[in-house]
Curated annotation (Swiss-Prot):
Species of the source: Orgyia pseudotsugata multicapsid polyhedrosis virus (OpMNPV)
DNA-binding region: 967-981
Enzymatic class: hydrolase
Motif segment (Nuclear localization signal): 692-701
Name of the protein: ATP-dependent DNA helicase P143
Gene: P143
Keywords on record: ATP-binding, DNA replication, DNA-binding, Early protein, Helicase, Host nucleus, Hydrolase, Nucleotide-binding
Length: 1223
């Protein structure tokens, strides 16, 4: 058995890299032979699980797992003779707390000492507690065999508990089944649901401390527990921000599913972990080794300093105005009136003599509603002549308001000026638009009214803070409840908060209910509450807003990205959703967010590059598993499973494209690839010490068959001599390289056969490539090449019979250097992509959890985010990655969709675009609009056909007008007028709910169409085409698919795991991410979030537009079939009208296969049909006229020809392949 193990697992010593009790790798395990002291390394937990499964049964034949599966077989076969006996071995496994969980065990003599004190029955409820908690002897040990299969103990936690509580030192090894001191008992538990551990607490040493990990409820701020147990320190941890954290423990057993070591490994803000000397004999954590593979230059490389980023510089505009006196006069008058309004409301507080009443209100409220004063005054200043006031006038206005109010208070002045900055950066047009939101009621001084509002607000605050009798989370909350409880003077409330308005045209009365305007009747309580007469409104549109609107958190300002108190001066009847929340943590820095979006374009390359390394690691792991079942066991199903798994990996690697093939070469044999790049340059470049700008590298071409053969031998065979010979197939034409290689080689085999391989390199590459391409199981190659003589004799015989063939152009990797440079660039930018252990997939991973961890480690680790909680970073990243997964990591589509979704919080449809989401079933389309439904006001309508006629009730029509997004699900057909009406930006309409009066609304919704089948739009034209943004998805989220360990695998197969409750899991993350998009992706001047032009230059979107157009319009179909294109004047080409008509005749023969099935049904009676309803015939004259109209700038009426136009001029050149949506 020892000789077999030496072939499977390499020996390691007790040096620093493989020190005993040193936690340096979450996957590696070490087996020790206690007789000889030999330590053997298993590179992956899977190797140990395969080894354990193979030796679990000491009987002949199938392993224990497959014996259970085959118990119902009727056939009786003679059992094969056992190849190896496992009984009585001396193997033990060293502890690794990431993957070593066991049934509780300890030496019999130790158990006898503590059995009266060890109480484990409290962790289970059982019908038969004695059976569950029974402890039995096995050899020299005692263990608990009847625990549930999903329950275990952390071996490290078990060691610590026994040592701290009882002073028992347990060896840091676990005996393996059939160990002579244990017997046929398997102590290991893999992936337990819960496990016993010693109670621990990891908290920072800050004030107040931040808890990073707890697994129990003990208060560790106490030095000693009530039971007398002392609190011990286990680790001291240094953090990235300079703080420290301490891991404390107490000798209590707890049952949990939380692993401290996973927190220490995964939290990117923890940099160094030092174990207390007292416990180093049990555990010693090396964070660097735990997080990074050892590779050339990785350990000794100094930390890379982040690139210098130029500071953001904003020019400061000097204030000036020809109307300075007018502005100052209006400010002075306004402040007097505002103060008067406040004094009337606040008479109860004796503040009428306070000259700084308004200033006190602003300062104490944190300038919460300071902007209301700016809106009001500026609106009065500019109401007669807006064009005379520019940015300099606005800047002067802000400075004069602030100086007039806070000229004697420098701190308040600075704060007020900062509050004005968002408007100065956007420009005067945006500020004018903001002020237009503010409604000034006729018949009342707007400043006095604002003063009454301020006074009522201040009144509530003073009342709530004057006594403990009032319980309130936020004393500044201005709402119905606080206004009534604080008994604000009713007259002030009626005038400035619960404002009553009446539409004089429709006689509809509305009252502001503390959040938004509500239609009321005379017998409603809200109507009776307000005794003042209603303000008369005429021809007023409600919800006519762009930058400010009511929300359940107050009035939201898109420009400042902040909330004001509820106020009645915005005429809105609804509360749109917003992505920002008042209690959200601070945004990530703009540089971090910009880095996230900038990385989007190369994420597929990043994931593909990682996927190559993952495949190679899997090959090494499966090779060991195959060797284990071949050499140690007789289980035929296990052997077949391993062979099939290895063969699947081989086929995936064998079928890689050129780009991935070169990346694979860099991982498998980086030095050889660099040799190729150097030795295939021109002579001048090879001789030069300094890099030269030469195009020779672009001419490097490598025999693809030879390269693939080299990589397969390097990776699967791993024979150094054969590998060296195989690489000579590539370097065969470089005599200097071959001669140098023969001088330095110490292999007689290489020296003997090098000439043969270089001379016949083309034939050898072709033969081996053909054999590998046809091979049934790749492990047969691994067996065949073990006999060098036989293998080389076969090659010589095959070469002799192989006909000579000239090198084929299609058998060359023509862009070798471009692929090499691309891979090298990715690996340089993301240096930890191949060497970070944290991003390796774990058994507990879902696709979402792995992808988030990968992004945090690989992408965000390049940015300084150490001051942000990991939970918040995770939330932003999860929201971002949702859009990537939904589009199968299509950069352009995901980028547009995230901007479209973010634009919904700016309540105006400035895009004139409808987003159309066709796709296969289960591609995630429903999840997209379900997420939006949680976040914004959505009106959803399910119908397959829409014409111009209304299909909804009046209540639903009003709901649609009040919504932020209008979603039509499973729409199959619609009219051109219906589509344009809802896709356009101007959508005002007068509607009424049932039993309520008519009101005029400004509709701010954007249109979203979702379906599985292609959409048919009747009377499709250029106007319809220009209003579409199309994102097609053809991947699926399936319940039976499991995460493979690499997202790129799912990108390729277009099959993703279907995760349950995904909307609930993602809604907060998507919201937080979209809040960042709104914050940082707005246009500088307008403050709007752009989305309509983001796909203009995307070739996939242009193709999908063509596909939609061809499917809906005969004219577009003819243009596509005939490939009609405009040409530059210099081309001097033309097509006669006669030829055009002739080719249109040929095209009409294929039109029906291009057009939507509904086309003939809906157009049977129209003039485009030259036949009958039953027999549809296209009118070629009408089609010709449509072509003339489409290319009117090219058509020459006098010459009856089309100038500067190219097209198919015969039947053989026409395109009869119907385009399909693609992504």
């Amino acid at each position: 058995m020892n000789s077999i193990l030496s072939r499977l697992f390499r020996d390691v010593t007790g040096d620093e890299e493989y020190a005993v009790n040193s936690l340096r790798d979450a996957n590696r395990l070490i087996i020790i032979d206690t007789d000889t002291g030999t330590r053997r390394l298993l590179e992956h937990v899977s190797n140990f699980r395969r080894f354990l499964n193979t030796i679990r049964s000491d009987a002949a034949g199938a392993c224990a797992r497959h014996q259970r599966a085959a118990r119902h077989d009727d056939e009786e076969e003679a059992p094969p003779a056992a190849r190896v006996s496992f009984a009585g071995h001396s193997l033990v496994l060293e502890n690794n707390d990431f993957c070593v969980f066991v049934k509780p065990f300890l030496l019999k003599r130790h158990y006898d000492e503590i059995k009266n004190y060890l109480k484990l029955d409290r962790f289970f409820k059982s019908d038969n507690p004695e059976h569950t908690n029974m402890c039995v002897q096995a050899g020299d040990y005692c263990y608990w065999p009847n625990w549930p299969a999903s329950q275990a103990v952390s071996f490290t936690g078990w060691q610590l508990y026994l040592y701290v509580e009882f002073g028992i030192v347990v060896e840091s090894t676990v005996p393996i089944i059939h160990n002579r001191r244990l017997g046929p008992v398997d102590l290991f538990v893999f992936n337990p649901r819960t496990f016993l551990n010693i109670e621990m607490n990891l908290s920072t040493n800050e004030a107040p401390p931040v808890k990073l990990f707890v697994n129990g409820k003990f208060d560790f701020e106490k030095k000693v527990a009530e039971s007398g147990k002392a609190v011990e320190s286990l680790f001291e941890i240094k953090m990235a921000n300079g703080a420290t954290a301490t891991c404390k423990m107490i000798a209590n057993l707890v049952n949990s599913n939380k692993n401290l070591f996973e927190v220490i490994r995964d939290n990117i803000n923890l940099e160094e972990c030092v174990t207390t000397p007292k416990y180093r004999h049990i555990i010693d954590v090396n964070l660097t080794k735990l997080r990074q593979f050892a590779h050339d230059g990785a350990v000794l490389a100094p930390p890379v300093e982040r690139a210098f980023r130029a500071p953001t510089v904003t020019t400061i505009l000097s204030a000036s105005s020809e109307n300075a006196e007018v502005i100052q006069s209006e400010i002075d008058a306004a402040l007097v009136k505002v103060r008067e309004g406040m004094v009337k409301v606040m008479a109860e507080f004796n503040r009428s003599d306070d000259p700084d009443l308004l200033q006190a209100y602003f300062k104490e409220s944190g300038f919460k509603n300071f902007h209301f004063l700016l809106f009001n005054v500026w609106k009065q200043i500019t109401k007669r002549d807006k064009k005379s006031f520019r940015e300099t006038d606005m800047k002067l206005f802000f400075e004069l308001v602030c100086e007039t109010l806070f000229g004697n208070d420098s701190d308040a002045l600075a704060t007020a000026l900062v509050k004005c900055e968002p408007f100065t950066t956007r420009g005067v047009a945006t500020f004018n638009s903001l002020c237009d939101h503010w409604h000034c009621f006729k018949g009342v001084n707007p400043y006095t009214l604002l003063g009454s509002y301020y006074g009522a607000h201040y009144f509530i605050y003073l009342k709530l803070t004057s006594s403990d009798a009032h319980e309130c989370d936020d004393p500044w909350a201005f709402n119905y409840k606080n206004a009534m409880e604080c008994k604000v003077p009713p007259k002030a409330l009626g005038e400035a908060f619960f404002i009553k308005v009446e539409n004089v045209v429709t006689q509809v009365t509305l009252v502001f209910n503390g959040e938004h305007y509500q239609i009321v009747k005379k017998d409603d309580e809200l109507y009776k509450l307000v005794e003042t007469n209603p303000y008369k409104l005429q021809n007023i549109k409600f919800n006519n807003w762009k930058y400010m609107y009511h929300t359940k958190y107050g009035v939201y300002n898109v420009v400042t990205d902040d909330f004001y108190s509820n106020c009645p001066f915005l005429l809105g009847t609804t509360m749109p959703g917003t992505f920002k929340r008042p209690d959200d943590p601070p945004y990530l820095p703009e540089a971090v967010f910009a880095h996230m979006l900038a990385t989007s374009a190369e994420e597929r390359d990043i994931l593909r590059t990682y996927h190559i390394a993952k495949l190679c690691r899997d090959v090494k792991m499966v090779k060991v598993n195959l060797g284990t079942v071949n050499l140690l066991g007789d289980c035929a199903p296990c052997k077949l499973d391993a062979r099939l798994r290895l063969n699947d990996l081989f086929r995936e690697l064998w079928n890689l494209d050129d780009d991935s093939l070169v990346t694979l070469a860099l991982y498998v044999n980086k030095l050889r690839v660099e040799d190729i790049v150097h030795n295939f340059k021109c002579g001048a470049c090879r001789a030069s010490v300094q890099e030269r700008k030469c195009r020779c590298v672009q001419k490097i071409k490598i025999n693809r068959q030879a390269l693939k053969t080299c990589l397969i031998f390097d990776l699967f065979v791993g024979d150094p001599e054969l590998t060296q010979l195989m690489w000579m197939l590539i370097f065969a034409t470089n005599k200097l390289y071959i001669n140098t290689a023969l001088i330095v080689t110490t292999s007689k085999l290489v020296a003997q056969h090098a000439h043969f391989f270089t001379k016949e390199h083309i034939k050898i590459a072709a033969i081996l490539h053909r054999d590998l391409h046809k091979i049934e199981f790749v492990d047969t190659l691994m067996a065949d090449v073990c006999n060098h003589d036989a293998f080389l004799a076969y090659l010589q015989h095959a070469v002799a019979n192989e006909p000579a063939a000239a090198p084929a152009a299609d058998n060359a990797v023509a862009k070798f250097y471009a692929h090499y440079a691309n891979a090298a660039n990715i690996l340089h930018k993301y240096k930890n992509l191949w060497w970070d252990k944290i991003i390796l997939a774990r058994d507990s991973d879902t696709l979402s959890s792995w992808l988030t961890r990968f992004y945090l480690r690989v992408i965000l680790s390049k940015m300084d985010v150490q001051n942000y909680p990991v939970a918040y970073l995770t939330q932003v990243v999860e929201g971002y990655l949702y859009f990537k997964r939904y589009t199968n990591f299509n950069h352009a589509s995901s980028y547009m969709l995230m901007h479209f979704a973010a634009s919904l919080s700016v309540p105006t449809d400035y895009g004139r675009k409808a987003v159309y989401l066709p796709g296969v079933p289960l591609s995630g389309k429903s999840t997209f609009f379900e997420l939006l439904d949680f976040l914004v006001l959505m009106h959803k309508f399910d119908d397959d056909t829409h014409t111009g006629a209304s299909k909804e009730t009046s209540d639903k029509e009003v709901s649609n007008l009040n919504s932020e997004v209008y979603t039509i699900n499973e729409l199959k057909k619609c009219s051109e007028s219906f589509f344009k009406k809802h896709a356009d930006s101007s959508k005002s309409d007068s509607k009424s709910r049932k039993y309520q009066g008519l009101l005029k609304y400004e509709a701010n919704y954007k249109m979203l169409i979702v379906n599985n089948n292609p959409l048919y739009v009747d009377d499709y034209d250029d106007g319809v085409q220009n209003r579409f943004l199309i994102v097609y998805t053809d991947h699926k989220f399936l319940p039976h698919v499991r995460f493979s360990g690499s997202v790129y695998h799912h990108i390729l197969t277009k099959q993703y795991p279907q995760e349950p409750m995904v909307v609930d899991a993602l809604k907060d993350s998507v919201r937080v991410f979209l809040a960042h998009v709104v914050r940082y992706q707005r246009e500088p001047q307008t403050g709007l979030v752009p989305y309509k032009t983001l796909l203009d230059s995307d070739p996939v979107h242009q193709h999908n537009l063509t596909r939609l157009s061809v499917n809906n319009s005969p004219m577009y179909a003819v243009i596509y079939i005939l490939n009609i294109k405009t040409a530059p004047r210099s081309a001097n080409t033309f097509v006669t009208e006669e030829k055009m008509q002739e080719m249109i005749g040929y095209a009409t023969l294929h039109l029906k296969s291009f057009l939507h099935p509904s086309f003939t049904q809906y157009n049977a009676a129209k003039n485009i049909n030259a036949g009958t309803a039953r027999s549809f015939v296209f009118d070629e004259k009408i089609l010709l006229q449509q072509i003339k109209d489409k290319f009117k700038n090219n058509y020459d009426e006098r010459g009856c020809k089309f100038n500067n136009l190219t097209m198919a001029l015969n039947k053989l050149d026409i395109n009869i392949n119907v385009p399909q949506f693609k992504c």
